[in-house]
Amino acid sequence: VPATFTLDGVTCNMDSGGGTGGGTGGSTGGDTGGGTGGDTGGGTGGGGGGDTGNRVDNPYVGAKVYVNPEWSAKAAAEPGGSRISNQPTAVWLDRIAAINGVNGGMGLRDHLDEALKQKGSGELVVQLVIYDLPGRDCAALASNGELGPNDIDKYKSQYIDPIAAILSDPKYAGLRVSTVIEPDSLPNLVTNAGGTPTSTDACVTMKSNGNYEKGVSYALDKLGAIPNVYNYIDAGHHGWLGWDSNLGPAVQEFAKVATSNGASVNDVAGFIVNTANYSPVKEPNFKITDTVSGQTVRQSKWVDWNQYVDEQSFAQAMRDKLVAAGFNSGIGMLIDTSRDGWGGSARPTGPGPQTSVDDYVNGSRIDRRIHAGNWCNQSGAGLGQRPTAAPAAGIDAYVWVKPPGESDGASSAVPNDEGKGFDRMCDPTYGGNARNGNNPTGALPNAPLAGHWFSAQFQQLMQNAYPPLS
């Protein structure tokens, strides 16, 4: 049944909001942070030598991208993993301790020093995920964070300020720093913070106390003041914000946060979509304008009245709306393609049958999830497009922000000291909730805590990679 309901005469979508969003970024993101978090301590700073502080329109053009040696070692240790272990992935700062390194792992300065070595005489981008807001991940449990809902001052003084101080070191001024700002946070305020079946008490709290907004504004302001830092705000994905009833309010929310509490639109290089999620860059076999026997594909259960069927069309349309709302015309979009390839034997090779609109869409779509609101350790997923600079109009890069092989969340309750709860969306036996239209989760079994290494998933991602691995 399409997860659609009417609120004050406006048609809304349950899945649109929390589902994929609530979790996908959050939890998948979160965990990613969780695992790589500690060591991935950090960052992207500015590098020594080179053209110090010369800002460019797209930091990825003409530059190498930092390969995190800690992720690379895990990937290379897997059978067949050396085929991708040299790919650049983001470093997740998912807790205060990650700044200096967790459990003996690399901290922020360690990553920046390594980045200077990788840079050589050319240009290099270091990708850093800022992910430690108060009351983090309010619509999911797999990647809850260390800071309570009211710990905004701690977030500023013990998290953002130390990161900004390190990134400001002249030693790193020649590096290009791409920062992904707080996955899931602002989209959760739009769809899960009151008045919808997907709302959670935690998101209502974070909307009412304003600390997500204050935190993101502060991060934009402090990091945006550093000449070689390029801030990209997380903007959910098409299966979360692709409905008009969500996209318009999301753009307004982004504009509000980028122009308050000291932040300016000049602090924003762009936005990122599909962070730690599984939505394809492009659906090659069908378009949103297709019809079957006079019925638009938007009426199918899969599309569920969404305006988009894939991430690139969503990102390009959102970019236009953001510029119209006052953001600079030079902003660019990033798309996380780390796990959205959907290759392998189950990948359709052409359009589905025209027997019904549902048969057509289900037979056409390369996204083989049970529901677009499913975000945790998805069965059948594969590595997506390899990181690429300027692949399409308005798109700064395809990036691997979520490091492949890091779990989105545990498939059963696991005691831990990382603050990570058990989210039933990671349980393959769970029947679902409002955020995924009450469908099965499609999650892989035997998954470890968010961010921890999940060998079985890594092997599946390689097996189902698209383009295939050679």
Q: Residue spans of the language-model regions?
A:
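Short beta-strand-plus-loop segments that form exposed binding edges in beta-rich domains
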Residues: 1
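Ser/Thr/Gly/Pro-rich low-complexity, disordered linker/stalk segments of secreted
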Residues: 5, 10-53
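N-terminal carbohydrate-binding/catalytic regions of secreted carbohydrate-active enzymes
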Residues: 53-167, 384, 402-470
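Structural recognition of the beta-strand scaffold that forms the well-ordered cores
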Residues: 64-67, 90-94, 125-130, 177-182, ...
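Surface-exposed substrate-engagement region within the catalytic domains
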Residues: 76-80, 241, 245-422, 426
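Surface-exposed cleft-lining segments at the edges of enzyme active sites
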Residues: 93-100, 201-208, 235-242, 295-309
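Substrate-binding cleft of extracellular glycoside hydrolase catalytic domains
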Residues: 102, 117-232, 249-256, 262-267, ...
